């Protein structure tokens, strides 16, 4: 147990809550319009839904842990903390990060880019005011946490140090 690992875990929990919730909302937006979750149904949404494509991209990049997003901060700190104990664990974690990046990039490419082949998609509308008022603040949060992580990390430092010291006392270190 070390401070980097615990700080990373806390930031990752916050990030995962925001990003995963936002990705589910993004799925809900297109499901609400098209009533299907089949990836093969979509393609070319950037042409009809540029705001949706932008916020979806921010959440997808946060999910894969791109630097400048909340996902990077948490993943980086967890990996730094884990590296102090086991490089094998780090290799496993890094492999999972790479696999999730491949899946998310494929998903984004398939849904957002390409040519609109489905006639129903030619009439799809971009985000309405309600959807924007929910998704845009979440996208801003993903970026703010990624650029200014100390906003969240600094208030956690003392409690994390107390957890570590209690852990060390309990384990006779």
Sequence positions of predicted segments:
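Functional transmembrane alpha-helices
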Residues: 1-125
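Cytoplasmic/organellar membrane-interface segments at the starts of transmembrane helices
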Residues: 49-51, 104-173
């Amino acid at each position: 147990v070390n401070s980097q690992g615990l700080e990373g875990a806390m930031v990752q929990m916050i990030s995962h809550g925001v990003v995963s919730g936002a990705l589910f909302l993004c799925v809900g937006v297109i499901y609400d319009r098209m009533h299907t979750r089949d990836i093969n149904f979509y393609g070319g949404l950037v042409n009809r839904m540029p705001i949706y494509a932008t916020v979806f991209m921010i959440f997808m990049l946060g999910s894969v842990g791109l630097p400048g997003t909340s996902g990077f901060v948490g993943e980086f700190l967890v990996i730094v903390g884990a590296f102090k104990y086991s490089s094998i664990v780090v290799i496993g974690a890094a492999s999972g990060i790479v696999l999730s990046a491949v899946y998310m990039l494929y998903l984004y490419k398939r849904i957002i880019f390409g040519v609109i082949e489905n006639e129903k998609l030619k009439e799809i509308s971009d985000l309405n005011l309600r959807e924007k008022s929910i998704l845009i603040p979440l996208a801003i949060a993903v970026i703010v946490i990624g650029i200014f992580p100390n906003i969240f990390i600094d208030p956690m430092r003392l409690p994390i140090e107390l957890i570590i010291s209690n852990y060390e006392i309990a384990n006779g270190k």
